[in-house]
């Protein structure tokens, strides 16, 4: 007898506006509970201090979350000059206080040095792992371990405001970029130290900012459904973005349903007009039903890489 699954097979991406003070995983678990979803996963953690866009993949969409992990991000950050902390943000302890002698011209010149591709050494207070343990666990024990620098790209970094000891910036960057580290490095470059006091992620990939919803929004809809004796999915599911929204930047290969059936059974197929190489987004029929992500094999065929498993709500 098949084991009954806990939750329902809901598929899609919900753009959560994460509040400050809770972890990304706590946010994920709340969304999973509200949607009563079988599976859920987020697409790149935000610090507890940070707020903003946290795409959460539900159901089959979790298979494609890596593409969002690898996508560009946008942030709004406020930094305080004159104080350096052990975490590079206001959640940490002040370890050094220095006088601030910085003018706007000097600040803008230093900020400009972060544009482009550079090497960044991740903060000890990060979720990256060393010998199987997150770096922040070592940091809390007062242990510093070696970290390899990583290539990051800052596509743009703009100074929005400079008042007193406060600096506000907007950053568009590649995956794996630590805004706290940029802020700490900026403070050292200026000779006065700095740390993050406010951080908001305003963009992931091409997802629209206005489509974000809060946990409170979802809880209110859940309560409304209970009051009106309606199925919660009637109010909650319309907020979901399609699961292939995570891979919208990939070239599409549309195929007739007969070929799609072969692909869904693990067989590569020849599709007229497909790219000659690379990763592709596969769709079926005139309705362009998303069936998964594939790649072009050595024979020029479209071969499955990650496939959607289709199940009805009643099949739980």
From Swiss-Prot:
* Keywords, ordered alphabetically: Isomerase, tRNA processing
What superkingdom does the record give?
Answer: Bacteria
Q: CDD domains, alphabetically? A: PseudoU_synth_EcTruB, PUA_TruB_bacterial
What would be an example GO MF term here? RNA binding
Isomerase among the record's keywords? yes
Q: Which reaction does it catalyse?
A: uridine(55) in tRNA = pseudouridine(55) in tRNA
Gene3D superfamilies with a match to the protein in the record = Pseudouridine synthase, PUA domain
Q: Which residues form the active site?
A: 47
> Quick one: signal sequence residues?
none
GO terms under biological process:
mRNA pseudouridine synthesis; tRNA pseudouridine synthesis
Q: What is its EC number?
A: 5.4.99.25
Record-annotated disulphide pairs: none
What's the family? Belongs to the pseudouridine synthase TruB family. Type 1 subfamily.
* Summary of the function given for this chain in its UniProt record: Responsible for synthesis of pseudouridine from uracil-55 in the psi GC loop of transfer RNAs.
**What is the protein name stated in its UniProt record?**
tRNA pseudouridine synthase B
Q: Which organism is it from?
A: Aliivibrio fischeri (strain MJ11) (Vibrio fischeri)
């Amino acid at each position: 007898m098949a084991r009954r699954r806990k939750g329902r097979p809901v598929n899609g991406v919900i753009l959560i506006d994460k509040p400050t003070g809770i972890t990304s995983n706590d946010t994920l678990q709340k969304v999973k509970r509200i949607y009563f979803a079988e599976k859920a996963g987020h697409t790149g953690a935000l610090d507890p201090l940070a707020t903003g866009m946290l795409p959460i993949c539900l159901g089959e969409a979790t298979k494609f979350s890596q593409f969002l992990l690898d996508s560009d991000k946008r942030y709004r950050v406020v930094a305080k000059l004159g104080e350096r902390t052990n975490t590079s943000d206001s959640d940490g302890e002040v370890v050094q206080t220095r006088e601030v002698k910085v003018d706007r011209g000097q600040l803008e010149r230093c900020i400009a040095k972060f544009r482009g591709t550079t090497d960044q050494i991740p903060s000890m207070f990060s979720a990256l792992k060393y010998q199987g343990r997150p770096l922040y666990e070592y940091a809390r024990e007062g242990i510093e371990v070696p970290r390899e620098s990583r290539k990051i790209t800052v596509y743009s970094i703009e100074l929005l405001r400079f008042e007193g000891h406060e600096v506000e910036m907007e950053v568009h960057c590649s995956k794996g970029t630590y805004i706290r580290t940029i802020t700490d490095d900026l403070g050292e470059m200026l000779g006065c130290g700095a740390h993050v006091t406010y951080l908001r992620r305003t963009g992931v990939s091409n997802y629209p900012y206005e489509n974000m919803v809060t946990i409170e929004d979802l809880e209110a809809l859940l309560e409304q459904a209970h009051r009106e004796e309606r199925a919660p999915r009637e109010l909650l599911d319309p907020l979901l973005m399609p699961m292939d929204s995570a891979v919208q930047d990939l070239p599409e290969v549309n195929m007739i349903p007969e070929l799609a059936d072969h692909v869904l059974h693990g067989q590569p197929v020849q599709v007229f007009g497909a790219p000659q190489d690379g990763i592709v987004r596969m769709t079926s029929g005139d309705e362009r039903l998303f069936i998964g992500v594939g790649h072009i094999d050595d024979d020029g065929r479209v071969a499955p890489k990650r496939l959607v498993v289709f199940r009805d709500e009643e099949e739980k």
